[in-house]
From Swiss-Prot:
Keywords: ATP synthesis, ATP-binding, Cell membrane, CF(1), Hydrogen ion transport, Ion transport, Membrane, Nucleotide-binding, Translocase, Transport. F-type ATPases have 2 components, CF(1) - the catalytic core - and CF(0) - the membrane proton channel. CF(1) has five subunits: alpha(3), beta(3), gamma(1), delta(1), epsilon(1). CF(0) has three main subunits: a(1), b(2) and c(9-12). The alpha and beta chains form an alternating ring which encloses part of the gamma chain. CF(1) is attached to CF(0) by a central stalk formed by the gamma and epsilon chains, while a peripheral stalk is formed by the delta and b chains. SMART domains: AAA. GO terms for molecular function: ATP binding; ATP hydrolysis activity; proton-transporting ATP synthase activity, rotational mechanism. It catalyses: ATP + H2O + 4 H(+)(in) = ADP + phosphate + 5 H(+)(out). InterPro entries: AAA+_ATPase (IPR003593), ATP-synt_VA_C (IPR055190), ATP_synth_F1_bsu (IPR005722), ATPase_a/bsu_AS (IPR020003), ATPase_alpha/beta_chains (IPR050053), ATPase_F1/V1/A1_a/bsu_N (IPR004100), ATPase_F1/V1/A1_a/bsu_N_sf (IPR036121), ATPase_F1/V1/A1_a/bsu_nucl-bd (IPR000194). It is an enzyme of class 7 (translocase). This is ATP synthase subunit beta. It is a peripheral membrane protein. Produces ATP from ADP in the presence of a proton gradient across the membrane. The catalytic sites are hosted primarily by the beta subunits. It comes from Paenarthrobacter aurescens (strain TC1).
Length: 483
């Protein structure tokens, strides 16, 4: 934080007046001896259509001449020059502790599903906090098993790590992160925190219902800054959720799951705020402090000695361009990246994870074992060879390939089908129950395909199945139908 705690308290209760309103940006004049510190929360009351409401701002700039520039966290309709503004003397604070579980909050920590008096918080923590010191950090290489074949085999997740789900519009990011909540939170048995950054109301409602049905809502806190809210709200909502997660990690010594959907909208909100503050834009119109803003968030999402925050973050890729500064800045902070492919999604193969571009820090024999590693490498080699042969196939046809290449293409097609899997979240669309496959069964299944043990089975038998038992059942049905 820029200011010390002493400086924050010194200006508590100071009164200023609004000098200018430009949309969500407000300039406020304070006495010379009571200028609010950066990040201080300011409040004012307005009456609109017969209703009185409190508007909260966050101090963002000192302009000189006793003026501060603040960003509103609510709509500024009805706000006029000369309105009195109070300095709280402290940053925005949110409730933390067991009392937040099972409830939905906004960026200010106000519950959206119950009255505020019903929340029994252990404490209120400011959302702007320092990242843990280097001495307190602890690295982790333990695998987090999800039961999804393509992820466990090719891009294994790390307990206490940061995981990114990258993809363009409509390729299944939100469905996959909801699937992770259903699977990991249910099997994890600990505390989860969900940050909806620029979330659609429909998606938020779907998530609430699914978590209730899965029985994980009672151990989860949800914090939403919806798509129709001001950019200041969308910029800070991830910090509000992270603060709740940090309390569970640091005070209650718990392992915490933190889900963020969507990091791109966090970046987008930062860009909007930067423009409103009059900063000169940087590459592709993004804010000049993009890397700094991302670092302030990501450096706090970490594991400390004895307890961890495991983070799963959905990241929208504008126009499927991975060189865009927003996704590119996020890459450096992640331990595992799962890239969703539009081309794979167009073939109806879900989850549409690209097996060749997705990565993991622990895809190494010393962490996951030789069998797992060797199978993952063989699968990638077959898929890469198949990709290289596609131009020849498109021009000359499969018949012009050598016998060896024909076998590679045949096995690659079976692998591609076997990487697809029914999910619990998608049951409402497909009518088919989801499946969970252990890492042992996953490795055995793909090893069998690579070794040619399943060359006699038609490739359609591998589509949207769990383990090899499902493949055998499908193959038996296909044979029965063709008799």
């Amino acid at each position: 934080m820029t200011a010390t705690a002493t400086e924050h308290v010194a200006t508590a209760g100071a009164t200023g007046r609004i000098a200018r309103v430009i949309g969500p940006v407000v300039d406020v004049e304070f006495p010379a001896d009571a200028i609010p510190s950066i990040y201080n929360a300011l409040t004012t009351e307005i009456t609109l259509n017969g209703q009185t409401k409190t508007i909260t701002f966050e101090t963002s700039q000192h302009l000189g001449d006793n003026l501060v520039r603040a960003i509103s966290l609510q709509a500024t309709d009805g706000l006029v020059r000369g309105t009195t503004v109070q300095d709280s003397g402290a940053p925005i604070s949110v409730p933390v502790g067991d009392g937040v579980k099972g409830h939905i909050f906004n960026v200010l920590g106000k519950p959206l599903d119950v009255e505020e008096s019903e929340i029994k918080a252990d404490a209120y923590w400011p959302i702007h906090r320092k990242a843990p010191s280097f001495a307190s950090l602890e690295g982790s290489t333990e695998m987090l098993e999800t039961g999804i074949k393509v992820i466990d085999l090719l891009t294994p997740y790390i307990k206490g790590g940061k995981i990114g789900l990258f993809g363009g519009a409509g390729v299944g990011k939100t469905v996959l992160i909801q699937e992770m909540i259903t699977r990991v939170a249910r099997n994890f048995g600990g505390t989860s925190v969900f940050a909806g950054v620029g979330e659609r109301t429909r998606e938020g409602n779907d998530l609430w219902v699914e978590m209730e049905e899965a029985g994980v809502l009672k151990d989860t806190a949800l914090v939403f800054g919806q798509m129709d809210e001001p950019p200041g709200t969308r910029l800070r909502v991830a910090l509000s959720a992270l603060t709740m997660a940090e309390y569970f990690r640091d005070v209650q010594n718990q392992d915490v799951l933190l889900f963020i959907d969507n990091i791109f909208r966090f970046t987008q909100a930062g860009s909007e705020v930067s423009t409103l503050l009059g900063r000169m834009p940087s590459a592709v119109g993004y804010q000049p402090n993009l890397a700094d803003e991302m670092g302030l968030l990501q450096e706090r999402i970490t594991s400390t000695k004895g307890h961890s925050i495991t983070s799963m973050q959905a990241i929208y890729v504008p126009a499927d361009d991975y060189t865009d500064p927003a996704p590119a800045t996020t890459f450096a902070h992640l331990d595992a990246t799962t890239e969703l492919s539009r081309e794979i999604a167009s073939r109806g193969l879900y989850p549409a994870v690209d097996p060749l571009t997705s990565t993991s820090r622990i895809l190494d024999p010393q962490y996951i074992g030789k069998d797992h590693y060797n199978t993952a490498v063989r699968v990638k080699q077959i898929l890469q060879k198949n990709k290289e042969l596609q131009d020849i196939i498109a021009i000359l046809g499969v018949d012009e390939l050598s016998e060896e290449d024909k076998i590679v293409v045949s096995r690659a097609r079976r692998i591609q089908q076997f990487l697809s899997q029914n999910t619990y979240t998608a049951k409402q669309f497909t009518g088919v129950e989801g499946s969970t496959v252990s890492i042992k069964d996953t490795v055995e299944g793909f090893t069998a395909i690579c070794d040619g043990e399943l060359d006699h089975i038609a490739e359609q038998a591998f589509f949207n199945v769990g383990g090899l038992d499902d493949v055998e059942r499908n193959w038996a049905k296909i044979q029965e139908q063709t008799k």
